């Protein structure tokens, strides 16, 4: 039986070098465009974790006040209340991105601070340290950006 179409010789299939380089160039452009957005999202996520850790530390301070009727220790030589181990860093497990501490306390007030770990992923963050006081007033230190930008 005769074929109506003559058979072409079998051609090797695969990718040419030009096609591979084109794909690599497209992937490089996509990575260059998407990485800054990813890094911004990651910083926001770490900052949100630190904000949640500050709220947890604030609840701890409220429980301390309920038990002792004051936010400080009552000892003039060591007035600041130390936060227990799970509350003194953000995230609670793994490598710390922020250190959570009581930076000011007296009988009727306190200020909590979330300070980026030096040489950590949040060290170059423009928001600097996040603060929270007994009235849940939010603040930032060591930066020129607004509180609203950092406490989203």
Predicted regions and their residues:
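N-terminal secretory signal peptides that target proteins for export/translocation
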Residues: 1-10
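Periplasmic/extracellular, small/polar-rich flexible segments of pilin-like filament-forming proteins
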Residues: 2, 66-152
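N-terminal single-pass transmembrane signal-anchor helix
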Residues: 10-38
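Residues at secondary-structure transition points
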Residues: 12, 41-48, 52, 105, ...
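Phosphate-coordinating loops and pocket residues in cytosolic domains that bind phosphorylated ligands
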Residues: 35, 40, 73-76
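Membrane-proximal N-terminal amphipathic helix
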Residues: 42-70
């Amino acid at each position: 039986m005769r074929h109506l179409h003559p058979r072409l010789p079998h051609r090797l299939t695969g990718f040419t070098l030009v096609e591979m380089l084109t794909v690599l160039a497209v992937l490089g452009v996509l990575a260059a465009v998407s990485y800054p957005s990813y890094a911004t999202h990651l910083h926001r996520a770490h900052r949100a974790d630190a904000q949640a850790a500050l709220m947890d530390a604030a609840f701890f301070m409220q429980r301390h006040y309920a038990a002792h009727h004051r936010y400080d220790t009552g000892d003039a030589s060591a007035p600041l209340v130390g936060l227990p181990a799970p509350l003194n860093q953000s995230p609670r497990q793994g490598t710390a991105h922020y250190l959570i501490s009581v930076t000011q306390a007296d009988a009727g007030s306190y200020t909590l601070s979330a300070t980026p770990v030096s040489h950590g992923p949040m060290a170059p963050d423009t928001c600097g340290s996040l603060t929270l006081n007994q009235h849940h007033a939010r603040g930032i230190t060591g930066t020129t950006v607004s509180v609203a930008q950092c406490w989203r």
